[in-house]
Structures are given as C-alpha cells and as structure tokens.
C-alpha cells in the first residue's frame, strides 16, 4: 500500500503539515536542520510507533507541546485504510486504524512495511549482531504470521529467566522457564534460518550489481552450538549463566554475518561501499517481500547524495524505480535528485519546519 496523504502535528520542528503524496517518488529538499529528515521520521514513526533518531519521546514532541499526532491514508489495489498515532510525553500511545482505537503498533507495521536507509544505517553492517538480527526479524515478521507473538514471548521468558538466575541455586528451579523457552527458541531460529536461506540469492544478485568487485557471502549463526540441542545447552550452562546472571546462549545471541572476499565487510569496504551494500540489502529484502506476498515496501532514504557518486546514485535510482514502490528521498540540493524525477513524482521544499510543494 502507498501513503497518499500524511498529516503531521507537533512532531520535531513541524507544527502542522498536510501533504498529498505521490505513489512513486517523493522528494524533500532543504538545508540541514530544515526538517526534511523529520518528515521521513514522522512516516517511520507512524509505521513503527517510535522514531529512528531518538528513543526519548521528549525530543520528538515539538517544544512546549503535550503530544504529537500523525495521521496517514493508505491506498492499496482494493482498499483504502486510514491510520493514526498519537503519543504524549509520558510515552502513552493511541493507535487508530480506520477510525477505531485500541490497536497495536504491530498492526501499523504490518500495513506499512518500510525500508530505512540513513547515514546512521551503517550499524546494520558494523554495529553488532543485534542490528543484523533485526534485519532478519523484519523479514520473519512480514513473512511468518506467528513470528511476532513467538518473538514477544521469547523476550518475556528470557527476561524472567535472567531474573530467576539471581535467585535460584539448582537447575531444577529453572526448568519451568526452559520448558517454555526451548520450543520458542528453536522455532524462531528455524524461521530465521529459513528466511536467510530463502533471501540469499536475492541478496547475492543485488550485491553483485552494486559491488561487482567483491565476492560476498552470508551466513546465519543461531546463537548456540550448531549440533547441540538447546535444552542441553541451557542445562549444561546453568552454573555459568548463574554467575553471569544472564542467559549466555540462545536466539538472542544470533548473528547474520556478511563477508567480502572472506573478511568482515566493516573491515574491508569503504564508507561509500558500505552504503551501497546497505542499499543493496534493503532493496533485496523489499523485493523479496513483494515477490513472496505481493506487498510493496515504502523506502525512506535520508541524505541521498551522501557517500555516493553520480554513477552509484543513478544505479540506486534505477533499481528503486524498478520496484514500483513508493519512495521518500531527502536531499540538500535538488541537483542531486533531478535525474530521478518524472511526471509522477512530487517535490517538497522544506524550510524551518514549513513544507511546500
């Protein structure tokens, strides 16, 4: 589904905005600090319930206001859906879908699958395993209907188990948690492994187009010994876990490793090449979703020209257009995106939180 209309109130430096959007490319042009990234962040927040630049709600709500309000209209082939999110300074949220309250943020995420490409997005490649787990979990969330509930239950059980490790003296006292934890861990790991295998060819093909000078490999590590039963791992590791006061092995320690010519990509690629790789991975993931489910992503790209030369920008623009997805791009200068515009695209000028088309 594409976002045809966006209303923003008291979000970052934007007091009020009402934007009619293109189902294709939408460009946000303005100087640094003008508010163009805030528009991207508002869209992201509408689909995720949280901002991507700050987890502190006070920094997202406009100065001296009590709450932000976001509203969007989504248009699909067969239906139109209205979505809304309000969040106050206490962090209390109201999610509204088609006029009714009481919905969950996960429902917004299902309606609005997004791929975010920002200058800070290098964390996907060099920021540690949790960011690469999140990459896999995004795919599992949108491809496996039971994933979100299982993942939420896993987080809850791990938190309870870790708390219990501070109190118990014998493994038998932990067994009730592990009886629930083990099947969830194995199911989530199987979903991640299946997804990483299914998308491998898409990633390899897209990366070969963006970075033909490198041989890239991808491997999923589930977070405990490959041939070991997870129940045995937990029981054998009880004394170590009790000393650490947390569970040392499991799906919460999984990783998705990416290597270039046999070495970690963060040690091999330049910043420009890392951005290309990040773009390739996000594109491959979005295209895989479309092929498997018929749904298209919204692509949010902040500071489009950063780290990319003209040829690389042209390649990325070409691939994005081929997806027939809705794309939002911020840039400091219109010159950087002129070759991406067409009769169906829209360009917005952003200046001190004011947005005009």
Curated annotation (Swiss-Prot):
GO terms for molecular function: ATP binding; single-stranded DNA binding. Keywords: ATP-binding, Cytoplasm, DNA damage, DNA repair, DNA replication, DNA-binding, Nucleotide-binding, SOS response. It holds the Pfam family SMC_N. Gene3D superfamilies: P-loop containing nucleotide triphosphate hydrolases (3.40.50.300), RecF/RecN/SMC, N-terminal domain (1.20.1050.90). Its main location: cytoplasm. The keyword DNA damage applies. Transmembrane segments: none annotated. It is found in: Cytoplasm. GO terms for cellular component: cytoplasm. InterPro entries: DNA-binding_RecF, DNA-binding_RecF_CS, P-loop_NTPase, RecF/RecN/SMC_N, RecF_2. It comes from the Bacteria. The keyword Lipid biosynthesis does not apply. Coiled coil: none annotated. One of its GO terms (biological process) is double-strand break repair. ATP binds at residues 30-37. Belongs to the RecF family. NCBIfam families: recf (TIGR00611). The RecF protein is involved in DNA metabolism; it is required for DNA replication and normal SOS inducibility. RecF binds preferentially to single-stranded, linear DNA. It also seems to bind ATP. This is DNA replication and repair protein RecF. It comes from Cronobacter sakazakii (strain ATCC BAA-894).
């Amino acid at each position: 589904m594409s976002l045809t209309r966006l209303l923003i109130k008291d979000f970052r430096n934007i007091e009020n905005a009402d934007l009619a959007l293109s189902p294709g490319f939408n460009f946000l042009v303005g100087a640094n600090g003008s508010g163009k990234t805030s528009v991207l962040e508002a869209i992201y927040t509408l689909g995720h319930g949280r901002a991507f630049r700050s987890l502190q709600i006070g920094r997202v709500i406009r100065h001296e206001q009590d709450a932000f309000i976001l509203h969007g209209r989504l248009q699909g082939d067969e239906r139109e859906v209205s979505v809304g999110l309000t969040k106050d300074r206490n962090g209390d949220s109201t999610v509204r879908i088609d006029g009714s309250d009481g919905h969950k943020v996960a429902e917004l995420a299902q309606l609005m699958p997004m791929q975010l490409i920002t200058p800070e997005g290098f964390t996907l490649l060099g920021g540690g395993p949790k960011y690469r787990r999140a990459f896999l979990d995004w795919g599992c969330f949108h491809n496996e209907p039971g994933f979100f509930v299982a993942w939420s239950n896993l987080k809850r059980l791990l938190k309870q188990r870790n708390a219990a490790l501070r109190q118990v003296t014998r493994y038998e006292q932990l067994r009730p948690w592990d009886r629930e934890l083990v099947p969830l861990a194995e199911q989530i790991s199987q979903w991640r492994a299946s997804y990483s295998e299914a998308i491998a060819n898409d990633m390899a093909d897209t990366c070969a187009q963006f970075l033909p000078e490198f041989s890239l490999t991808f491997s999923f590590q589930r977070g405990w010994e490959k041939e070991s039963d997870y129940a045995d791992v937990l029981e054998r590791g009880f004394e170590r876990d009790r000393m650490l006061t947390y569970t040392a092995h499991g799906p919460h320690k999984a990783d998705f490793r990416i290597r270039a010519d046999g070495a970690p990509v963060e040690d091999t690629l330049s910043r420009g090449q890392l951005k290309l790789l990040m773009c390739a991975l996000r594109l491959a993931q979005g295209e895989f979703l479309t092929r498997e489910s018929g749904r298209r992503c919204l692509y949010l790209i902040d500071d489009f020209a950063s780290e990319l030369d003209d040829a690389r920008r042209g390649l990325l623009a070409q691939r994005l257009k081929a997806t027939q997805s809705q794309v939002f791009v911020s840039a400091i200068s219109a010159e950087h995106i002129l070759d991406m515009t067409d009769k169906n695209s829209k360009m917005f000028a952003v200046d001190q939180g004011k947005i005009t088309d």
